[in-house]
């Protein structure tokens, strides 16, 4: 009976038990969390989330993870689902209080800030907001999420796009992060604008396994102790050029798998203890300042597959132990000072895919055993003094797809006739220093290479006749520059896929064939520096043409200007003999960005229709023509215009007021015209203006705003208003607000040129050129360094004292205030200009002594104080002793032993005209004297390598021809 009762009770309880069991296994999500998710869906219009419907259990929805016991939503993965819109502080997302894992990566939150309300999600362990177009300052509240083990706030560089909005942090963020997030294992803040030092406390996050601080604008000394965190497996400090540091002595218990230090200011030796990183698979120590030898112990890193030591200051030979790295696939050591022969052990690296040896001092030939690298695809050995038959061993590696052998000292191209043995070759670069030592190259050797897409040959004589019909038709890029070609290569017309053609720096004469402009895929042509004289008579711009870049500069073209395509973005016809007016058809080039028609014989006025180009134009160079009339009012919408040069023409009238619309303008040059106007103070609204040249016009009035407004122009680095009719007294605080010339430059940053880097079909960029008076002579700079600073007020009617505030311009390198009516004393504040290289205050009425403090200016290579009323001794400084006597003449009151050392027995002199022969000798002496002073005398070259860059760009014959004897005489007599 009892058994029966128990059985009945059991049967009665079964349904209740089953109901309880089913309830426990269904894990129905809570209604409030379902509602929050649906509200979030509506906030962003998630059209692709078909599973997100009210009738189903949200735990089964795509991207949702629920807790098995409670049914709470603990995971939300909405990465890469094209969310678009503002992530707002009242978002229903923040109602999901049980979240542990949240991934919103790769969406577009439309530059909205990260809401502080994330701190409500106190259970978060993983948060990924990467690549989601968030901007603004990261809220400090985020650091209250103390359970975080993974935090990803990274974004991308977008190639330096200034319009891109980055995330940023305040100074307290990193120290607080190090204190609060002690459980953190993964931190990625790449391209967050940190803009600070990394605190030492980071080394206390002992759980840290992965740290990515790429592109964070870090500076200061990086704590090396962070590299010694025992659990750290990956660290990336790349693209922080102002971040200093050294590699520590590594310990055996290090867990590093990947170490990336790229484009930083890290320095010092690579320690022998690098061999302690037994598990390392990727080592990148590139574009920094590491020095010394590659340690032999590096060969102990048996798991290493990627090794990059490029662009440092490493010396010595590649150690033979490198052959022990049998897992290595990529090997980069280019851009160092490595020397000697390549080790034969390189042949042991049978998994190698890439070798880069470029820009070193390697000698000898390639080891024959390198032909055993059967998986090698990319071989770069440019710019080394290799000799001998370097090609021969490479021709035995059929896997090769890319070979760069430019800038080597090959005795000959031995073996190139066997290049057909590389059937997979896609890219071939070869350049020779001295093509007179190389036999002519027959282009037919490339005819069997059906995969060849890029062929770059330079400074090797070639013959373009008798080219076979099966010449590689898949070529997309063909460069035959400096190859001694005399006739236009006919075989090119067979290139049905050709996109880029470079025939520059040859001796091609005659006319450009009409078929060139009809090639359907061609988008870039460079025919510069040849002897071409015209175009086929029937040629017209083809409406089907895809040409975006054409360079016809430095030829013998004459007659009307020819425009081969309506899709041009870059066009240069400079240094020819084009005549006539600028054709109105140019106004139809709606995509034109760079137009250079300088140094021709174009005449007439600028067509008003150029206004249609102003929305796209970035560089307009019309200098040295015969253009006339006024500059038209066409610039109001020229917001992209970076450089405008109409110098050395016959322009007249006033400067157009619409220039204030050129908000991106960096260079304005209207020198050597007939413009009659007052100083354009209204242009101080152009916050990017770096170069302003108004010389040799009819400008008049004062150089300071009588309304008391500051001079402005915060970025101005070069101003030349010489040889005009400016008058008046410069106020004592005149130079007070010249920010770019007074702010200290970072000496660790490599000097750059003022340029537009985006020249289509060219890697060289489009550089700003300029003619300036420096050290007594006119000079043409084909490229202008951004650190170059100059003021030229000479040849006006300025008077009064030279303002003491001139001493604030600590970055000033050239100062010319000659041929005015300045009075008073030479301001002693000039001694503050430690970078000053050229000082000309001649032809004034300045009195008193030369301040002895100027003798401390070790950079001052050229001085002219002649024809004033100076008295006393010249300073004792070496620079003053090295000047010519003419630098002091016309000052009867100057005396003393220092002057006698320079001039011997002193005779009073007056500025008179001299014989033509004497003038010619003097101008040449003067020209070369400042070059000698700037380069040959070490204390005068604080400018260092940067000044060298400028000097190599000077065209002595050109500016002597253009600004020769009469210019020199005028300078002396004023």
Curated annotation (Swiss-Prot):
Q: Where are the LRR repeats?
A: 96-120, 122-145, 147-166, 181-204, 206-229, 230-252, 254-277, 278-301, 302-325, 327-349, 350-373, 374-396, 397-422, 425-448, 454-472, 473-495, 496-519, 521-542, 544-570, 572-589, 590-616, 618-638, 639-662, 664-685, 687-712, 713-737, 785-809, 810-833, 834-857, 859-882
Q: Which residues lie on this side of the membrane: Cytoplasmic?
A: 952-974
Matching Pfam families: LRR_1, LRR_14, LRR_8, LRRNT_2
Mainly localized where?
A: membrane
Give the transmembrane ranges.
Answer: 931-951
Annotated glycan sites: 54, 90, 253, 279, 300, 348, 434, 466, 484, 529, 577, 603, 624, 637, 737, 816, 845, 864
Q: Where in the cell is it found?
A: Cell membrane
Q: Which cysteines are joined by disulfide bonds?
A: none
Protein name as annotated: Receptor-like protein 7
Source taxonomy lineage? Eukaryota, Viridiplantae, Streptophyta, Embryophyta, Tracheophyta
């Amino acid at each position: 009976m009892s058994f029966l009762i128990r059985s009945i009770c059991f049967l009665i309880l079964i349904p209740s038990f089953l109901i309880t069991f089913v309830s426990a296994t269904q894990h129905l999500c809570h209604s409030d969390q379902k509602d929050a998710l649906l509200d979030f869906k509506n906030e962003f219009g998630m059209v692709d989330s078909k599973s997100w419907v009210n009738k189903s259990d949200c735990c089964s929805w795509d991207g949702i993870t629920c807790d098995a016991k409670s049914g709470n939503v603990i995971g939300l993965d909405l990465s890469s689902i094209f969310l678009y819109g503002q992530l707002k502080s009242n978002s229903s997302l923040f109602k999901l209080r049980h979240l542990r894992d949240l991934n919103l990566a790769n969406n577009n939150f439309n530059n909205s800030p990260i809401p502080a309300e994330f701190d409500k999600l106190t259970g978060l362990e993983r948060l990924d907001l990467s690549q989601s177009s968030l901007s603004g300052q990261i809220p400090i509240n985020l650091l209250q999420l103390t359970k975080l083990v993974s935090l990803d706030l990274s974004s991308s560089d977008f190639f330096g796009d200034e319009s891109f909005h980055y995330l940023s942090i305040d100074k307290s963020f990193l120290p607080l992060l190090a204190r609060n997030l002690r459980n953190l294992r993964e931190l990625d803040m790449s391209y967050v604008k940190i803009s600070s030092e990394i605190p030492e406390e980071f080394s206390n996050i002992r759980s840290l396994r992965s740290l990515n601080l790429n592109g964070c604008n870090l500076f200061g000394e990086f704590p090396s102790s962070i590299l010694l965190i025992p659990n750290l497996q990956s660290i990336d400090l790349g693209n922080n050029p102002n971040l200093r540091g050294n590699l520590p002595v590594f310990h055996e218990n290090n867990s590093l798998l990947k170490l990336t230090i790229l484009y930083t200011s890290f320095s010092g030796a690579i320690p022998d203890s690098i061999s302690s990183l037994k598990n390392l698979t990727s080592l990148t120590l590139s574009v920094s300042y590491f020095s010394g030898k590659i340690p032999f112990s590096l060969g102990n890193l048996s798991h290493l597959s990627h090794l990059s030591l490029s662009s440092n200051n490493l010396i010595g030979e590649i150690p033979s132990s490198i052959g022990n790295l049998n897992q290595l696939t990529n090997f980069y050591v280019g851009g160092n000072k490595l020397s000697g022969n390549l080790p034969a052990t390189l042949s042991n690296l049978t998994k190698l895919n890439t070798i880069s040896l470029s820009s070193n001092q390697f000698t000898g030939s390639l080891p024959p055993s390198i032909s055993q690298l059967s998986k090698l695809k990319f071989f770069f050995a440019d710019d080394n003094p290799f000799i001998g038959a370097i090609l021969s061993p490479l021709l035995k590696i059929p896997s090769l797809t890319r070979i760069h052998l430019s800038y080597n000292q090959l005795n000959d191209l031995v073996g190139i006739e066997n290049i057909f043995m590389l059937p997979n070759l896609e890219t071939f670069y070869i350049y020779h220093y001295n093509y007179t030592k190389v036999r002519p190259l027959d282009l037919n050797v490339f005819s069997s290479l059906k995969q060849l897409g890029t062929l770059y040959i330079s400074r090797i004589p070639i013959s373009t006749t008798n080219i076979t019909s099966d010449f590689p038709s898949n070529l997309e890029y063909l460069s035959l520059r400096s190859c001694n070609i005399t006739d236009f290569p006919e075989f090119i017309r067979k290139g049905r896929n050709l996109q880029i053609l470079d025939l520059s720096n040859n001796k091609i004469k005659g006319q450009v064939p009409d078929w060139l402009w009809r090639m359907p895929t061609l988008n870039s042509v460079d025919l510069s520096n040849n002897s071409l004289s015209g175009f086929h008579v029937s040629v017209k711009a083809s409406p089907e043409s895809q040409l975006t870049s054409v360079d016809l500069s430095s030829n013998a073209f004459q007659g009307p200007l020819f425009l081969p395509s309506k899709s041009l973005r870059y066009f240069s016809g400079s240094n020819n003999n084009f005549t006539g007016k600028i054709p109105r058809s140019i106004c139809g080039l709606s995509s034109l960005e760079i137009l250079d028609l300088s140094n021709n014989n174009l005449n007439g006025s600028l067509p008003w229709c150029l206004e249609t180009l102003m929305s796209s134009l970035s560089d307009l160079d019309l200098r040295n023509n015969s253009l006339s009339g006024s500059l038209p009012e066409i610039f109001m919408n020229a917001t992209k215009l970076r450089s405008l040069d109409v110098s050395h023409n016959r322009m007249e009238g006033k400067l157009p007021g619409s220039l204030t619309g050129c908000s991106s303008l960096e260079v304005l040059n209207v020198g050597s015209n007939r413009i009659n106007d007052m100083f354009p103070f209204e242009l101080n609204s152009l916050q990017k203006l770096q170069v302003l040249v108004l010389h040799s016009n009819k400008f008049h009035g004062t150089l300071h705003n009588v309304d008391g407004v500051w001079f402005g122009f915060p970025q101005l680095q070069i101003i030349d208003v010489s040889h005009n009719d400016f008058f008046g007294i410069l106020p004592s605080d005149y130079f007070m607000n010249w920010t770019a010339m007074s702010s200290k430059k970072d000496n660790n940053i490599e000097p750059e040129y003022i340029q537009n880097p985006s020249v289509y079909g060219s890697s060289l960029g489009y550089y700003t050129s300029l003619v300036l008076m420096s050290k007594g002579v006119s000079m043409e700079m084909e490229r202008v360094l951004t650190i170059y600073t100059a003021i030229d007020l000479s040849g006006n009617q300025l008077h009064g004292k030279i303002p003491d505030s001139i001493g604030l311009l600590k970055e000033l390198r050239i100062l010319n205030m000659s041929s005015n009516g300045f009075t008073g004393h030479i301001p002693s504040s000039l001694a503050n200009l430690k970078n000053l290289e050229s000082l000309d205050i001649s032809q004034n009425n300045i009195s008193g002594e030369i301040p002895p403090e100027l003798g401390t200016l070790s950079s001052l290579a050229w001085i002219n104080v002649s024809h004033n009323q100076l008295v006393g001794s010249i300073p004792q400084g070496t620079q003053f002793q090295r000047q010519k006597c003419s630098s002091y003449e016309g000052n009867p009151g100057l005396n003393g032993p220092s002057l006698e050392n320079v001039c011997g027995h002193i005779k009073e002199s007056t500025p008179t005209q001299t014989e033509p022969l004497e003038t010619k000798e003097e101008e040449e002496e003067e020209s070369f004297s400042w070059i000698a002073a700037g380069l040959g005398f070490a204390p005068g070259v604080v400018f260092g390598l940067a000044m060298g860059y400028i000097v190599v760009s000077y065209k002595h014959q050109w500016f002597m021809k253009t600004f020769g004897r009469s210019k020199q005489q005028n300078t002396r007599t004023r």
